[in-house]
């Protein structure tokens, strides 16, 4: 994005997103791509490849399992790093919506829009919608939703989390999956440190998701870190951070 969005431009982007994918034929997902080769693609930006060293995306891709032909919603997409990874994984006949709220920061909007112009985003579109109503209108056939390191932020924002979780459930097809990652808080802290430490208790997040009808199916331990004392902000530079990753499914 080399320009600032007005609310009208955001509305246009949202409508364009829905028009792009809502009526596309549903493609059958194929075999998983070579995720290591995807990450090594020569047209990925140097910034993203540097970010890979910190974010370690390979085990996440292997755990989540995006495949060509899938339709994916990337919640709290931010500047689009994870959206692009999903878009590359579902290419050439899939679709990815990168969701951000209309009141996201100008810096975040600019980063996402600039990314949309790159080759890796040809199967992606902006989805400018609130967290508690995140999918394009009428969407009920998503194969996957990803929600990375932002659920804790909704605990102090003006977001109805119960409505958000139910909306995600409704947007998935039966058998579709929700893969969610967040920064771990101490037992008993629940949502109380969402704004101060940018963390959330794993059991609290799981309980909220399951209350919407999701079935818990797997946990990934690849981003856990026992050296984290959980008493400092998750954004503390160079500090060890304990992250949990959970996979849920909408029952058939």
Q: How would you label these PLM feature ranges?
A:
Residues 35-61, 67:
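Class I SAM-dependent methyltransferase Rossmann-like catalytic core
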Residues 228-252:
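Core SAM-dependent methyltransferase catalytic element
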Residues 146-150:
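A conserved beta-strand element that flanks and buttresses the S-adenosyl-L-methionine
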Residues 69-78:
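Conserved class I S-adenosyl-L-methionine
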Residues 87-88, 160-174:
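A short glycine-rich, Lys/Arg-flanked "PGG" loop and its adjoining helix->strand segment in the class I
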């Amino acid at each position: 994005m080399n320009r600032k969005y007005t609310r009208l431009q955001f509305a246009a982007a949202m409508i364009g997103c829905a028009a792009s994918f809502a009526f596309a034929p549903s493609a059958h997902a194929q075999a998983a791509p070579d995720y290591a080769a995807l990450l090594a693609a020569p047209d990925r930006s140097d910034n993203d490849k540097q970010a890979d060293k910190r974010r370690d995306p390979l085990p996440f891709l292997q755990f989540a399992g995006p495949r060509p032909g899938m339709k994916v919603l990337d919640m709290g997409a931010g500047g689009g790093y994870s959206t692009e990874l999903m878009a590359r994984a579902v290419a050439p006949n899939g679709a990815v919506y990168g969701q951000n709220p209309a009141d996201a920061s100008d810096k975040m909007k600019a980063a996402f829009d600039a990314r949309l112009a790159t080759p890796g985003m040809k199967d992606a579109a902006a989805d400018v919608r609130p967290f508690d109503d995140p999918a394009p209108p009428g969407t009920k056939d998503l194969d996957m939703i990803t929600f990375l390191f932002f659920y804790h932020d909704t605990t102090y924002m003006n977001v109805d989390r119960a409505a958000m979780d139910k909306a995600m459930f409704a947007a998935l097809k039966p058998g579709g999956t929700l893969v969610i990652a967040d920064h771990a808080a101490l037992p008993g802290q629940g949502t109380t440190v969402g704004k101060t430490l940018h963390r959330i208790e794993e059991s609290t997040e799981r309980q909220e998701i399951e209350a919407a009808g999701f079935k818990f199916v797997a946990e990934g331990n690849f981003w856990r870190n026992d050296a984290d004392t959980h008493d400092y902000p998750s954004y503390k530079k160079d500090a060890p951070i304990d992250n949990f990753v959970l996979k849920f499914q909408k029952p058939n």
